[in-house]
């Protein structure tokens, strides 16, 4: 199975402008993400960006970058454009979308994202981590996976929500926003219009579920730090300086 890892990066973050180039231990944040993606050992790693300075920084550190349009509404749209430019011969079968603001991500969980594709019925694969901190259960910024257990380490996703769900006894799962797509699934997904539940929850993945696509989540133990604020950036600097 030929795999391409794509890392979408844009400079226009509302809470932390310019974060792809934020310095962490002497290298831009986007380069740390690319290094960890390469360590996953799945295949080619390319940063997809709309900003020339990001592309130049990535290339200066020995990684590939491809320029994309500036008007994309989502990372999925950006990686779809990048895929078409990088693989016109359609040799790539699976695409892993690694967010560009995860500089501490464990390469092992990037590799784990492909495991659900052992089932040919799965269109999109993603990751989840069991929630252990009580405050995360009610935090709307922590997206939860509501799913049917397939094994001790896998769920079939039925819904994603910012609410505390499901109700009752049992574990809750924190969704890690990393996606692996079969090529046909990515092409179908980006052709869909935003869905009602997607708009309501502000969660793009609900578009796929509402269209009848299957998403399975591999349950892992490592939760990467998403860098969205100056405070997150300082935490990442502390983690990566050790």
Curated annotation (Swiss-Prot):
Pfam families assigned: CTP_transf_3 (PF02348)
The entry's cellular-component GO terms read:
cytosol
EC number of this enzyme: 2.7.7.38
Q: Which SUPFAM superfamilies match?
A: Nucleotide-diphospho-sugar transferases
Where does the protein end up?
Answer: Cytoplasm
Catalysed reactions, semicolon-separated: 3-deoxy-alpha-D-manno-oct-2-ulosonate + CTP = CMP-3-deoxy-beta-D-manno-octulosonate + diphosphate
What keywords were assigned to this record? Cytoplasm, Lipopolysaccharide biosynthesis, Nucleotidyltransferase, Transferase
Q: Which enzyme class, named as a word? A: transferase
List the Gene Ontology MF annotations in alphabetical order. 3-deoxy-manno-octulosonate cytidylyltransferase activity
Q: Which InterPro entries does the record cross-reference, listed alphabetically?
A: Cytidylyl_trans (IPR003329), KdsB (IPR004528), Nucleotide-diphossugar_trans (IPR029044)
Instruction: Give the GO terms filed under biological process for this record.
Output: CMP-keto-3-deoxy-D-manno-octulosonic acid biosynthetic process; lipopolysaccharide biosynthetic process
Q: Tell me which Gene3D superfamilies the record gives.
A: Spore Coat Polysaccharide Biosynthesis Protein SpsA, Chain A
Pathway participation: Nucleotide-sugar biosynthesis; CMP-3-deoxy-D-manno-octulosonate biosynthesis; CMP-3-deoxy-D-manno-octulosonate from 3-deoxy-D-manno-octulosonate and CTP: step 1/1; Bacterial outer membrane biogenesis; lipopolysaccharide biosynthesis
Identify the domain of life.
Answer: Bacteria
Keyword set includes Phosphoprotein: no
NCBIfam families in the cross-refs: kdsB (TIGR00466), PRK05450.1-1 (NF003948), PRK05450.1-5 (NF003952)
Q: In UniProt terms, what function does this protein have?
A: Activates KDO (a required 8-carbon sugar) for incorporation into bacterial lipopolysaccharide in Gram-negative bacteria.
Q: Which family does it belong to?
A: Belongs to the KdsB family.
How is this protein named in the record?
A: 3-deoxy-manno-octulosonate cytidylyltransferase
Q: Which organism is it from?
A: Mesorhizobium japonicum (strain LMG 29417 / CECT 9101 / MAFF 303099) (Mesorhizobium loti (strain MAFF 303099))
């Amino acid at each position: 199975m030929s795999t391409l890892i794509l890392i979408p990066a844009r400079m226009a973050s509302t809470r932390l402008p310019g974060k792809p180039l934020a310095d962490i231990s002497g290298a831009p944040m986007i380069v740390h993400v690319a290094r960890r993606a390469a360590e996953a050992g799945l295949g080619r790693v390319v940063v997809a960006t709309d900003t020339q300075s990001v592309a130049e920084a990535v290339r200066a550190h020995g990684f590939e970058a491809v320029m994309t349009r500036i008007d994309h509404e989502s990372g999925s749209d950006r990686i779809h454009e990048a895929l078409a430019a990088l693989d016109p011969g359609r040799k790539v079968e699976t695409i892993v979308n690694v967010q560009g603001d995860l500089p501490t991500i464990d390469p092992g969980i990037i590799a784990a994202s492909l495991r659900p594709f052992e089932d040919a019925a799965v269109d999109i694969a993603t990751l989840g981590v069991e929630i252990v901190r009580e405050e995360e259960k009610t935090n709307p910024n922590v997206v939860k996976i509501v799913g049917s257990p397939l094994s001790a380490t896998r769920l079939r996703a039925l819904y994603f929500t910012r609410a505390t769900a499901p109700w009752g006894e049992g574990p809750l799962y924190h969704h890690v926003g990393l996606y692996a797509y079969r090529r046909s699934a990515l092409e179908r997904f980006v052709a869909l219009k935003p869905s009602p539940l997607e708009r309501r929850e502000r969660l793009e993945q609900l578009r796929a579920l509402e269209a009848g696509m299957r998403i399975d989540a591999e349950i892992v133990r490592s939760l990467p730090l998403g860098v969205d604020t100056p405070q997150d950036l300082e935490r990442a600097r502390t983690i990566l300086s050790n």
